[in-house]
Amino acid sequence: MTNIHNHKILILDFGSQYTQLIARRVREIGVYCELWAWDVTEQQIREFAPTGIILSGGPESTTEENSPRAPEYVFNAGVPVLGVCYGMQTMAMQLGGLTETSDHREFGYASVSLENSTALFANLNDNSTASEPKLDVWMSHGDKVTRLPENFKVTGTTLTCPIAAMSDENRRFYGVQFHPEVTHTKKGLELLTNFVVNICGCETKWTAENIIEDAVARIKEQVGNDEVILGLSGGVDSSVVALLLHRAIGKNLHCVFVDNGLLRLHEGDQVMEMFGDKFGLNITRVDAESRFLGELAGVSDPEAKRKIIGKVFVDVFDDESKKLTNVKWLAQGTIYPDVIESAASKTGKAHVIKSHHNVGGLPDYMKLGLVEPLRELFKDEVRKIGLALGLPAEMINRHPFPGPGLGVRVLGEVKKEYCDLLRRADAIFIEELRNSGWYEKTSQAFSVFLPVKSVGVMGDGRKYDWVISLRAVETIDFMTAHWAHLPYDLLGKVSNRIINEVNGISRVVYDISGKPPATIEWE
């Protein structure tokens, strides 16, 4: 079996908003990497045995006395090191150079003139003139290196930053003041490939097929002939976990699909057809709609609704698990960002992936071992694996759907009548987005039920019915978002269909709020 962890890159996080992006780019190249806090110990680095190390950017200033520093062992480990932005500055400082606060903070596009050939920039040039190589890059820094460490040379300059890149070719130490991990740096991926593959010598074995083979082998080794239970929602993460486990242990996997009455139109039937009929999984459908809606009756506060939905799910799932007396393991769809976020919430920083991560919320008396086949993977990697396992692209690339489902898309109190109306309206909206080619152009689109009535006219009579709001946004990272400028004729068609086909809706509006100040979801 291919050893996909044999060659690996260690990324030390100094707090940049782009650090996870570095990890995703390295994985995209085909090499495994992990993201750790900057203050790891020498022992931890030795045990991990990285093939190369990347020092990330960060918001601190190396001119401050107590600013973060890389462990000294990083520069004595005998492996290549790449410093990015703050990572370059701390490398320079720690190896005997100098940094200063810059008179001109650089933020945005810049052109770096390349000089003194270096392996890091091999075959890279954004300039049409081969004799004057330049790179179009993205800068974001307030400090700059003003004196090189011994044995370093300048490999890149800008008009305001005389040392925009540096290298010590003998020790294979490299620094860039810009961010190669962002797409604004045109040759960023090629630069990282030069470092990871050509300089560090990593083999590109981190592929979907190899990851699947490795995950299946590890599941078999972990659970043996034991039985495993999984809460299958039909979302990407739990679906991929289900197929990996099914491939590894077959009928020893017990999937529980809790139909809470808060799903999209026909979604429950689609989940059963996909995983029960098509893939042949051992799956139980629990109709818990009345139980969820009963607990939600009279509750209008969004946070209270979320907590109720979470608690009822745990209770229902626990009731089902008690019927399976031989189950020894609980499978979860924990992914790598969950691990990083969980560690950061406890310690204030990302930490080693191997430290145990348990998503809270399940009762203490469920004394089951934890199986988390996706805990090393980013979301985009999970999607690639899903496609390789045979999940349809339409499902893999579906827009995000909140955990509480329609419970937070029906504003205020949740009632069956409201959910039924919203389901049908939302299905029309999504259908028309797909038909017009706009579904793929938007990052997230959905309908919201407003618990207010509005007067309308139908035929010769007046009607006094409910209001639906349509929401569609475009975003890269879901941290900020712009409302999608859908064509008027498309919005008109959706509105007409909803009002004519969904009895009980008299008015349709379109949400043109960005994030910030609004959030993407209404609740």
Swiss-Prot record:
Natural source organism: Haemophilus influenzae (strain PittGG)
Its biological purpose: Catalyzes the synthesis of GMP from XMP.
Residues annotated as the enzyme's active site: 85 (nucleophile), 179, 181
Domain GMPS ATP-PPase as annotated: residue spans: 206-398
Any one Gene Ontology molecular-function term assigned to this protein's record: ATP binding
Pathway assignment: Purine metabolism; GMP biosynthesis; GMP from XMP (L-Gln route): step 1/1
Domain Glutamine amidotransferase type-1: 8-205
Official protein name in the record: GMP synthase [glutamine-hydrolyzing]
EC number: 6.3.5.2
Any one GO cellular component localisation term in the record: cytosol
Catalysed transformations (reactions): XMP + L-glutamine + ATP + H2O = GMP + L-glutamate + AMP + diphosphate + 2 H(+)
Gene3D superfamilies: 3.30.300.10, 3.40.50.880, HUPs
Alphabetical UniProt keywords: ATP-binding, Glutamine amidotransferase, GMP biosynthesis, Ligase, Nucleotide-binding, Purine biosynthesis
Binding positions (ATP): 233-239
HAMAP family given in the database record: GMP_synthase (MF_00344)
Quaternary structure note: Homodimer.
Top-level taxon of origin: Bacteria
